[in-house]
Amino acid sequence: LLIIFGARYVLQQANRIQRDPNFKIEDETNPYLAIDKVENMQGYWTVALFGVDSRDNSLGKGNNTDVIIIANVNQANGEIKLVSIFRDTYLNLDDDGTYNKINQAYARGGPKQAIKALNKNLDIQIDDYATFNWKAVADSINILGGVDIELSKAEFYYINAYITETVEATGVASQHLKSAGMNHLDGVQAVAY
């Protein structure tokens, strides 16, 4: 019975995934990869994770990516390696030779352009991607029960204004914090932090 409910939950979540119907990741193979590199990548699943600064819950182009993580999964043993790409990393964004911050690739052309730029500049082949916004992060942290963070006085000075903005952007309820020091943050408070 537990397995049935678990499978049902996973299917419900999968049905909530927003995908661009005009973008097929399999069309974004990296033509620049050497044959030996392609052979070395067999048995691995490479996923680009994009965290967008979206206040209207949109996930497509027009949003800057504040978080870019490349996750590489060894399918034989389940080992996962993560690499964070700094949003201000200056890379070649498209075929016309335009260089800019990598977070601009997603803003200009959504996941398609971001994946193409990452593949080309980092000599990788991204097999899949996921995009998440503030609400998804807040909901995930709430599901996990929150997080404990030590807030300095300087951080406390600003955080409540960001909490208000995050509540308005996500529609997820939260409360202002009362003091600096150790605080147990809910999802919205953690996103604001």
Regions found by a protein language model. Give the residues of each.
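Non-catalytic, solvent-exposed segments at the cell envelope interface
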Residues: 4-193
